[in-house]
Amino acid sequence: MLGECHAHLMMNAVDYQRAVADNARAPREDLVRGFLEEYRRLGISFLRDGGDRLGASRLAKELAPEYGIDYRSPIFAIHKAGHYGRVVGFPFETMGEYRDLVARAKAQGADFIKIMLSGILDFDRYGVITSAGLPVEEAR
């Protein structure tokens, strides 16, 4: 079995701005099916997606069985307002808002919860993270 363990299917791996524009109104089923068909053609039968805020990951999860793909997704990521994560999910400010987002992910069929604990690596500056991490007391 071949698997992809950190995908963001919505991002298309080519042009992020175009990917967002393509899915802005609603996830494009033709594009999602095209990606799933390519994974199948390559012999990939397991895909762990990181989610997105536009719904492409949710649609892919629904369609993947047609392609023989075991597709796991958080549907979307959860991040602290003002911190890294807007690209792939929704923000929270209070623990009540966090709980609401967890319930929303569960209701939409999430296989796991993805919470952004830190920024990402700054590829222009060695060893630098793009934003401060979530405070330890909130991460618990």
Tell me the role of every PLM-derived stretch.
Residues 2-62, 84:
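Metal-associated gating/positioning segment near the N- to mid-region
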Residues 96-117, 121-140:
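Histidine/acidic residue-rich metal-binding segments in metalloenzymes
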Residues 61-77, 129-140:
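Alpha-helix-loop-beta-strand connector modules within alpha/beta enzyme cores
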Residues 28-38, 91-105:
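Short, acidic/polar
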Residues 18-20, 80-87, 121-126:
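A short acidic, helix-capping loop that chelates divalent metal ions and anchors anionic groups
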Residues 29-58, 68-79, 110-124:
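Divalent metal-dependent hydrolysis catalytic cores, especially in the metallo-beta-lactamase
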Residues 3, 71-81, 86, 94, ...:
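Acidic, metal/ion-coordinating pockets
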Residues 23-24, 87-93:
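The substrate-binding groove and active-site-proximal loops of carbohydrate-active enzymes
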